[in-house]
Every structure is written in structure tokens, then in C-alpha cells.
């Protein structure tokens, strides 16, 4: 699989792979190809389609070195696959729409921040569903 390979209609391998260029991993581009990846990305594509607007992935998979360097939780879903998504234009209403639709679609993890929403499918691997809001 090359970095230009599309995983879904609107999301590519490159967008999801580890981009730790400013970290100790040097941008290793790792991305485990697993059932969890496809499950999560099918849901993310469906969310994007329902939203009717493009989403920027600001963080996808992280290797352990990258995750440590950004202060990620030791058991972060980004070590598997999670996506921090940001609507273009950082529109607050669109962030709320992303949160609402993600909840309706039963994403396993939904975390709302000032400029992005964290989405993951932790339930797929047996983790407890989680919701949090870190907006200031």
C-alpha cells in the first residue's frame, strides 16, 4: 500500500499514518492495517458524508515514540487508530454537528476540544465507551 492509496472515498493512507516529523520518530508513516482501521474509517467516511463537508485529519495513528513526544495517554487509541478531525474553517457549529452525528453513529470515543473532535472506535476492541469535553 502506498501513501497515496485511498482507504475510503475521502480519506487516504497518508492522512492517517504517523506524521511525527517534529518528534523522535521522524515521521515514520506507520499505520497498522487491521479490521479496526477499516471499521473506524468506514464510520468516519459515513460521518463525513452525512455532514456534507470536508474534514481535515489533524492526527491519526501515532507510533509509540510520537505518542510519548506529544504527551499522549499511554493507552491512547491513537496507538491503534483514532482521528482528530477539524472542519475546514474551524467553524464552531460544524464542530457541534460532528459531535452530534458521531454520537448518533455510536463512535466509541468522542472528545470535543476547542478546534477539533477526537473520534475513535474503542468499543470495537472491547474498551468502554467514553465521552469528554475539553473545551475552554
Where are these regions (language model features)?
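Helix N-cap and loop-to-helix transition residues
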Residues: 12, 37, 63, 90-91
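N-terminal start-of-chain detector that recognizes signal peptides
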Residues: 28-30, 55-60, 90-94
Amino acid at each position: 500500500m502506498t501513501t497515496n492509496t485511498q482507504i475510503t472515498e475521502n480519506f487516504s493512507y497518508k492522512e492517517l499514518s504517523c506524521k511525527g516529523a517534529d518528534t523522535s520518530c521522524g515521521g515514520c508513516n506507520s499505520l497498522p492495517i487491521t479490521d479496526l482501521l477499516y471499521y473506524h474509517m468506514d464510520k468516519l467516511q459515513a460521518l463525513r458524508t452525512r455532514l456534507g463537508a470536508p474534514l481535515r485529519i489533524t492526527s491519526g495513528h501515532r507510533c509509540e515514540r510520537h505518542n510519548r513526544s506529544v504527551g499522549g495517554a499511554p493507552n491512547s487509541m491513537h496507538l491503534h487508530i483514532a482521528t482528530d478531525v477539524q472542519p475546514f474553517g474551524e467553524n464552531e457549529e460544524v464542530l457541534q454537528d460532528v459531535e452530534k452525528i458521531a454520537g448518533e453513529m455510536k463512535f466509541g470515543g468522542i472528545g470535543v476540544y476547542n478546534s477539533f473532535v477526537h473520534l475513535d472506535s474503542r468499543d470495537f476492541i472491547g474498551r468502554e465507551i467514553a465521552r469528554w469535553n475539553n473545551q475552554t
